[in-house]
Amino acid sequence: MSIKRRIYLAAPLHDEADQARNHKLACALRAEGYEVYLPQEHGKWEDLVSKFGGKDVTRRYLYNMDLHAMQRADCCVAYMDREKGPSEGMLWEMGYMSGCNKPVFLLNPGFKWGYNLMPEFGSMCFDTAESLLCHLNEEDFIGSEVQV
């Protein structure tokens, strides 16, 4: 790949299983040559609160870091767990990226139409990581928009 594309990876981070899955997906994308921003890689919440001296300061710092990463990214890859449903943060990130006219690719194993209108029509949906990677590697998605 000649251009190192930047991907913002939006996904739930509620528990260790989510974080392990997110890490695995980020590694797969990086192995294909993409630069991946994964919010959970900031570090542990307790360590960050200690570093910045409080919860409010830490929350503002994380928000600004994530917002800056979305602005720099060429696209968003979002993961939606059908069993747990989407996270509010992930949906916000998808909407922000879509509003910036950046492509949003939704990885939703077991995807079925009719689950949620906005994520489905505001993104390109994939049901396997392999199909997502194949599409990313074949498409020149920089500057493209999702067609409805």
PLM regions with names:
Residues M1-V148:
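Conserved catalytic or regulatory cores that recognize and/or transform ribose-phosphate-containing ligands
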